[in-house]
Swiss-Prot record:
The 2 G (guanine nucleotide-binding) domains are essential for activity and function cooperatively. The KH-like domain is required for ribosome recognition. This is GTPase Der. The lineage of its organism: Bacteria, Pseudomonadati, Pseudomonadota, Gammaproteobacteria, Enterobacterales. It comes from the Bacteria. CDD domains: EngA1, EngA2. GTPase that plays an essential role in the late steps of ribosome biogenesis. GTPase point mutations (but not a deletion mutant) are suppressed by mild overexpression of RelA, probably due to increased levels of the stringent response mediator (p)ppGpp. 50S subunits assembled in the absence of Der are defective and unable to assemble into 70S ribosomes. GTPase activity is stimulated by YihI. Overexpression rescues an rrmJ deletion, stabilizing the 70S ribosome. It comes from Escherichia coli (strain K12). One of its GO terms (biological process) is ribosomal large subunit assembly. One of its GO terms (cellular component) is cytosol.
Amino acid sequence: MVPVVALVGRPNVGKSTLFNRLTRTRDALVADFPGLTRDRKYGRAEIEGREFICIDTGGIDGTEDGVETRMAEQSLLAIEEADVVLFMVDARAGLMPADEAIAKHLRSREKPTFLVANKTDGLDPDQAVVDFYSLGLGEIYPIAASHGRGVLSLLEHVLLPWMEDLAPQEEVDEDAEYWAQFEAEENGEEEEEDDFDPQSLPIKLAIVGRPNVGKSTLTNRILGEERVVVYDMPGTTRDSIYIPMERDGREYVLIDTAGVRKRGKITDAVEKFSVIKTLQAIEDANVVMLVIDAREGISDQDLSLLGFILNSGRSLVIVVNKWDGLSQEVKEQVKETLDFRLGFIDFARVHFISALHGSGVGNLFESVREAYDSSTRRVGTSMLTRIMTMAVEDHQPPLVRGRRVKLKYAHAGGYNPPIVVIHGNQVKDLPDSYKRYLMNYFRKSLDVMGSPIRIQFKEGENPYANKRNTLTPTQMRKRKRLMKHIKKNK
């Protein structure tokens, strides 16, 4: 088994900074105020070629109420999952009562625990860590995570001895970030191969929406465990959380994202960075579930987020949450509003669910698989050209400057989303209405559902364009005689 290392401690002691340092990413949000990390987050790290899984957790200080209580529960769950615990303290702040409470809990769990004193830059390390020996956790490892000082020594003295006793593991099945990056790279490489099998890869599924529409509740309902902090306050998820799972024999990487709100309401840099990571999660996903609050209806921000999903070319499933408890009259009004405002998204399935009670959730994955299969289906050049020919026979292209636009052949230009490349003459002059006609014709003929389809046009090149033949001496003499004759008859 690959070792699992949990970073625990009070809020704002530098756990996320060390997490980013170990995983060589910026996957954990970092800012100078307590309570920023709310869920436990997994990342892949290695030392001297040996891999381990690092878990970043929310802080525990013993004064939690509301959502902070749930953050503390996530931290305690991370301790149970871990093989090794790095207990981090703040050397600048000194020993705090919360540090003593955490140390007491760690001793009761009998987990291998190592005490790490962070923020020792500018201090005498030996003097700064003296008070922490009273915690009774043995040797103290002073580091400055923000600058990387002492981190390598920590790895060599703490983690490497543990990993030398473990055989390298070839398959990592719990590290979601590893899955996401590895499969994205593998997807990009294998798409160029004829024997590419999209069914062999996990489906990366992002759950997005405005704050407090029930994304994390839906994630937990799907997983069957309280994996993501859920609390009735907008913005309790600030990071994008990658979670591997399996359902009906198919593997998935579930991405629970931070809520995206109106730009004017994004008041601090942390939330702006969370929005960026949400948009990056959409780019990384194969299929996106857009969660909409049935009680609040379609907002401009929902449409803005929908536009980003479409521009990214991602497959889409629309989920209308909080459907329970609504009267039949209100439900009809919501459906009419959806038809009116989302009429241009005719390819996406719409599901009405209650994530809290689980009604309608079981049917979501049928649409997810349908959308993924549509976006990754391989179609040959002969089939695409035949469909294009049928479309032209049913409805001829318009005349452009007195000449009919000629479409010659079509072939696949990419997948996820499906791209059809059409070659012909004067295709750049085709009106948008005819391009939409072709797109809809291909969608109907290929039975593409849940995924956008894109059509690109390539103009046939004239090999003689901008070229002039040089005249032979005989042709030059004829040309001169002709020019004389023309001048003489003027």
